[in-house]
Amino acid sequence: LADKVGLLSGGQRQALTLLMATLQKPDLLLLDEPTAALDPSTASKVLGLIRTIVGEQGLTTFMVTHNMADALSMGNRLIMMWEGRIIYDVRGAEKDALSVEDLLRKFEEVSGSALDNDRMLLG
């Protein structure tokens, strides 16, 4: 507790921020790129912490991510946006059956464009 926040690692800061944001059990938890700029190991730990806290507290959570594997593995609904509009909205068993490749195909089908940014394809 005596450590200065500025001296914490990125993952430690993300974890601390998540804990602070959920102390009062918010009506809606907004997570904007919660694993951005984190190495894969730390990102996995942060996602695990998110799953635990959200699950234990039963929080309604809206997570923004460009990582399609994370989008598929987290939550019960996936909304894909492009150029400011919703192009795909899926939930439940249909979402659970999807792969990153399925999402890429759906994006290309609906948008008419192919994704070429490796960051979006991580998984």
Question: Model regions: which residues?
Answer:
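H-loop/switch region of ABC-family ATPase nucleotide-binding domains
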Residues: 65-66
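Short loop immediately C-terminal to the Walker-B catalytic DE motif
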Residues: 35-36
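Conserved catalytic motifs of ABC-family nucleotide-binding domains
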Residues: 25
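Catalytic Walker B motif of ABC-type/P-loop ATPase nucleotide-binding domains
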Residues: 29-32
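Helical segment within the ABC ATPase nucleotide-binding domain
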Residues: 44-57
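Helix N-cap at the start of a conserved alpha-helix in ABC-type nucleotide-binding domains
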Residues: 40-42
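Conserved beta-strand-loop-alpha-helix hinge in the C-terminal portion
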Residues: 85-111
